[in-house]
Amino acid sequence: MNIVLSGKREICGNILSAVLGENGVKRLYFGEYFRGEPFAEIEAVKEPSVLVETWDLSGIERILEVNGVFLREFMSIYKDTVVYLIESPEENYLCLKGRIIPHYWSPRDNIDEIAREGRFRGEVVDNSTFLVFYENRFFAVKCNQSINIDVKDSEVEFSAENMSKDFVLVASGGVSKEAVLREVSSAVKNPLKIAGLRAKWLKSLLSKIPSLQTKRKDFIDLWKYCWYVILTNRSVVENHPILVKPFNMPTKYVFRHQWLWDSAFHAIVLSLYDVNLAKEELYNLFHSQKPDGRIPHEIFLSKTICRRLWRVDDYCPWTTQPPVIAVAVKRILDKEFDRGFAKLAYEKLVKYDEWFSLERDVDRDNLASYIDYLESGWDNSVRWDDPIARLREQPDYYHRLYPRARMAPVEAVDLNCLLYVQRKTISELAEALGDYETSEKYYALAEETRKKILQYMWDEETDFFYDVYEDTHEKIMVKTPAAFLTMFAKIATREQAEKLVEHLFDPKEFWTTFPLPTVSADNPKYDPRGYWRGRSWINMVWFTYWGLVNYGYLNEARKLALKVIELMARGPTCSENYDSSTGEPVGAEDFGWSTLILDIMRDLEKEQL
């Protein structure tokens, strides 16, 4: 099996990834440890012209015209080694420059401070090789000709003058100085070996993907591409105290660590490929669980980055994320019941649910609250505008309820639908494991949560579910796709589901070019390119699709799915999100949870896709 694309400029290995620009390697990342910006920039009098551009399983090949000279450019990555080649039929007298710096989270970060905290240092090995060190990681860069190397306190700059006709630049990262130096020495002598190893690795992975029964070539191309994304986002981080098992990064080009709800979605997709990989995806999350029961929002590769971003001396922040993990556990165990995994998941989910009851339910009504917009997963959503404003108006009042709150506590409709599913799942696991008392307890708790959602969150006038403030149960009248999780969780009544379907297919609300914008299109704050303020995300499509199926709206589910699949198949693309008014892919490339479309395609296949 092969995948051939035109115009794709991103390529990744294990925790190493790179992105081509118009004139060389625009960005290179080694996890959350190092970045090259640029890594290899061709200096030319005029901007290079890209004449031909082909991406396949072996790497990326381009033909460039630079200062009247035609160059063949090739880049490949295998594991944590990258090779970059430039071939010229004649002397070109071109120069190339690059630099390596410690990784930062925001362009506003102080690189000098980060370098000091992570003990960054550079070292010249010889006239063609240098090494950098940061947070117990090494990264070596080597060329097949002499280069100028300038070691500074927080970066290493390098340049190659009068590049040879067969120019080779390689780099490799790892935990051993000797190993990375051996790797670059080997790769610079035989760079095409890296391309061969990469192609062999990817062909092996893709040979095991399930087949898709459809006559649509563009659908098959999307199917293969999304499998490429979910399988190559898998990562192994050596010598990490929490990331002890392989896991999927959401994307290796932006979000290079593990997130809670992302990994739950990844596990759901991986269960279609290999149930053991799906279980493995959740192990680090279980391992990261804190003594009080909280499963953290995210697990950083770099403690320095987490400390600077969250002001905690840890690899994890103090927040959680939407509890989709029980949904993933149920999907895995429905595929294959593993008693050992079921017992582990049961114990972890019970502790996690107890944490929600103790730490996110101050009014003890069996509805939990978000107290930080980032732990909602909907970062800058219109949903949180008023709650953030309320906290600013009454900080003392809200901080008495929750000292770390960054918005007025919100009993969110999606959070509590997921908690309902989690409590039902715990009840089912307890019964399967013979703990009937706990099973009855969590069944009753789930029922209380369901009743309160129906009592407080449904609005008769607008026929829609809304978030409510925890202290007053006043509705926050912002329509979002979170309401459709009441159908996913089977909480909505038949009559309510009918009304929700009307909202879904209203072009003024959620039936936009790319369906399900993160706020209804009739909201004054709707922005079709706004991150969580109007873009469309595939996880919301997935929840809504299965909600429609749950209530027997099979034609409507198919209509939703096909509209989304058609747009994604145009590339194919598997982007972080999409402009809801045009369908244009936006956000990060090769985004993990957007492969949830595979789960939908697999279900649609039963009816002839």
Question: Model-found features: residue ranges?
Answer:
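Extended, well-ordered alpha-helical scaffold segments
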Residues: 183-197, 218-225, 274-287, 338-357, ...
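Terminal accessory carbohydrate-recognition/targeting modules of carbohydrate-active enzymes
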Residues: 1-218, 254, 261, 273, ...
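Short acidic alpha-helix initiation/capping motifs at coil-to-helix transition points
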Residues: 200-207, 258-259, 444, 478, ...
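Extended glycan-interaction surfaces of carbohydrate-active proteins
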Residues: 216-257, 286-315, 365-411, 451-535, ...
